[in-house]
Amino acid sequence: MMGKTLIINMNDVHIEGDILDLSGENTGVIYNMSKEVEEEVAIDYVSEESKYELKERKYDACTFFFNLNNIWGGRRKESIIREVSSYLKEEGSIYIWDVNKERGKIIDNKVKVLLPNEKVKEVEFKNYNPLITCTFEEVKKILEKYYKIEETKVWEDIFFIKGVRI
């Protein structure tokens, strides 16, 4: 059973430089948004195989797009965020869009992403595990250990956090 359709307006989001996109199966949103900003964009998608190559590079920005809610436990989330921080340049930025998911809740939603040039990308996201949580407060608290929080937004069931590496 499909839940709500949520809307994210990304017309005013500008991510510049080399981007490390950790969006997993939601790939394409960050790429489509970024290629409107710059002619040539280097976006790397992380998989287990590419982790070793990452250690050789430093990125200007890192993005998570609705994938932290699939990670079990706060310590695991923190470990991933800490690792990603090591791939960012000094003062690199992290951008996180995710769903506010309390314990016991399941998610089956569609997200319409409004991109530059009036493009629209639809993404479905599901999380049927009632034990996993992913809340704005939980993620913000982890980020504050490694980043200066520059911007936050919470609307409907979604949150956005932008931080700059400290």
What kind of region is each of these model predictions?
Residues 2-5, 41-53:
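A short, well-structured beta->alpha microelement
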Residues 14-28:
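Conserved class I S-adenosyl-L-methionine
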Residues 51-64:
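A short acidic, Gly/Pro-enriched loop at the edge of an enzyme's catalytic core
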Residues 70-90, 98:
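A short, conserved alpha-helix within the catalytic core of class I
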Residues 99-146:
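C-terminal alpha-helical "lid/dimerization" subdomain adjacent to the S-adenosyl-L-methionine
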Residues 140-166:
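Core SAM-dependent methyltransferase catalytic element
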